[in-house]
UniProtKB/Swiss-Prot annotation:
Family: Belongs to the fatty acid desaturase type 1 family.
PROSITE patterns named in the record: CYTOCHROME_B5_2
Chain positions of motif Histidine box-3: 387-391
Motif residue range(s): Histidine box-2: 223-227
Tissue: Essentially expressed in liver and kidney and to a lesser extent in heart, adipose tissue, stomach and pancreas (at protein level). Higher expression in lactating mammary gland than in liver.
SUPFAM superfamilies: Cytochrome b5-like heme/steroid binding domain
Protein name: Fatty acid desaturase 3
Length: 449
């Protein structure tokens, strides 16, 4: 009989796609684990083995995103990220090189097979309840109230003149509008509004580009990695913030290596100076522009240019060039505070470290928590207070998170997974507490290890 990796007693594992109709080679996990190298990457989906080494560069989500799942069972990630599985499976066919040996488990390592099976049943139940179908009226109203705020801000300045009161009110209204734009483009980026991915991405380019001045491709490049491997160093861009801030396991590592680029034991204090005020205004603006130029995203660049043109044409007649620039900076700083506090309250206080190769549900729950819902918090946070549900089901429209939450709670209770829900203010305070704890750990390791 043929050995593992040999369809019928051949000399070894077959490289390249399996010929149509030929018996598929079989592989063990110990073989698959060897293919997690630059230029040599395999992954497993529904027990079938795919060689993505060359194709990864053409992956619509980016080579880094799909590469984060190399040498792993990517079945649940595959289902989580894609709407039309029948369509995307066509791209898998040429990459198929074999399947897992019959005696091999579907997942590598010490993963809980019953937990994984129950999570897939949970997803199927959500699909049967039609929780992945969007209410387009809900999202139309969201877009409408964003546009209404843009108009209201301009009318305030137009009718009252560019005085302090009208200018401050306009800046606040524009900042709220920009914050809600983040939420709406986030929905579109996850393809959770329209039935076709293409429609979502075209609409996202409009919202992200014309209404915000950023690149939709840049956002997706960053954000999809965050969803694939939340709170994992070198895979989640949101926690790759050293040497400015130390989070999770990096605190001990920097301390032991005697690295002191900043007074990390005071990072919970300087966070207020360079975190919330500057993330959107400085870091995102620079990173976004660099991405569009380096990756030659000219369409996104034109969309972004249309935002800046509209903004300056709208307000320069009242403020002049310098005053309009100051208004823009004020809006960016205000929205930056919203962005940092709202997006990080669910993640920074949670487990942050190196890859542990958990199953999809366990990895998401280890890195996320919820915030107590209310009509205001749901709106203000763009439903990111339901971060657990969002991370488990990224393509689910956010207006259905409340409906799926009881099913998720029951699933977590059955398997002993921590379904954490915090009051809003507690979640915000925990960000500072987490930064202080990491700084203290760094100082102890720096002085004593």
């Amino acid at each position: 009989m043929g050995g593992v990796g040999e369809p019928g007693g051949g000399p070894g594992p077959r490289e390249g796609p399996a010929p149509l109709g030929a018996p598929l080679p079989i592989f063990r996990w110990e073989q698959i684990r060897q293919h997690d190298l630059p230029g040599d990457k395999w992954l497993v989906i529904e027990r079938r083995v795919y060689d993505i080494s060359r194709w990864a560069q053409r992956h619509p989500g980016g080579s880094r995103l799909i590469g984060h799942h190399s040498a792993e069972d990517a079945t649940d990630a595959f289902h989580a990220f894609h709407q039309d599985l029948h369509f995307v499976r066509k791209f898998l066919k040429p990459l198929l090189i074999g399947e897992l040996a019959p005696e091999e488990p579907s997942q590598d390592g010490a993963q809980n097979a019953q937990l994984i099976e129950d999570f897939r049943a949970l997803r199927q139940a959500a699909e049967d309840m039609k929780l992945f179908e969007a209410d387009t009226t809900f999202f139309a109203l969201l877009l409408g109230h964003i546009l209404a705020m843009e108009l209201l801000a301009w009318l305030l300045v137009y009718l009252l003149g560019p005085g302090w009161v009208s200018s401050v009110l306009a800046a606040l209204i524009l900042a709220i509008s920009q914050a809600q734009c983040w939420c709406l483009q986030h929905d579109l980026g996850h393809a959770s509004i329209f039935p076709k991915s293409r429609w979502n991405h075209v609409a996202q380019q409009f919202v992200m580009g014309q209404l915000k001045g950023f690149s939709a491709h840049w956002w997706n490049f960053r954000h999809f990695q965050h969803h694939a491997k939340p709170n994992i160093f070198h895979k989640d861009p949101d926690v790759t913030v050293a040497p400015v801030f130390l989070l999770g396991e990096s605190s001990v590592e920097y301390g032991k290596k005697k690295r002191r680029y900043l007074p990390y034991n005071h990072q919970h204090l300087y966070f207020f100076l360079i975190g919330p005020p500057l993330l959107t205004l400085v870091n995102f603006e620079v990173e976004n522009l660099a991405y569009m130029l380096v990756c030659m995203q000219w369409t996104d660049l034109l969309w972004a240019a249309s935002f800046y043109s509209r903004f300056f044409l709208s307000y320069s007649p009242f403020y002049g060039a310098t005053g309009t620039l100051l208004l823009f900076v004020a809006v960016r700083v205000l929205e930056s505070h919203w962005f940092v506090w709202i997006t990080q309250m669910n993640h920074i206080p949670k487990e942050i470290g190196h890859e542990k190769h958990r199953d999809w549900a366990s990895s998401q729950l280890a890195a996320t928590c919820n915030v107590e819902p209310s009509l205001f918090i749901d709106w203000f946070s763009g439903h990111l207070n339901f971060q657990i549900e969002h991370h488990l089901f990224p393509t689910m429209p956010r207006h259905n998170y409340r409906r799926v939450a009881p099913l998720v709670k029951a699933f977590c209770a059955k398997h002993g997974l921590h379904y954490e829900v915090k009051p809003f203010l507690t979640a915000l305070v925990d960000i500072i507490g987490s930064l202080k704890k990491s700084g203290d750990i760094w100082l102890d390791a720096y002085l004593h290890q």
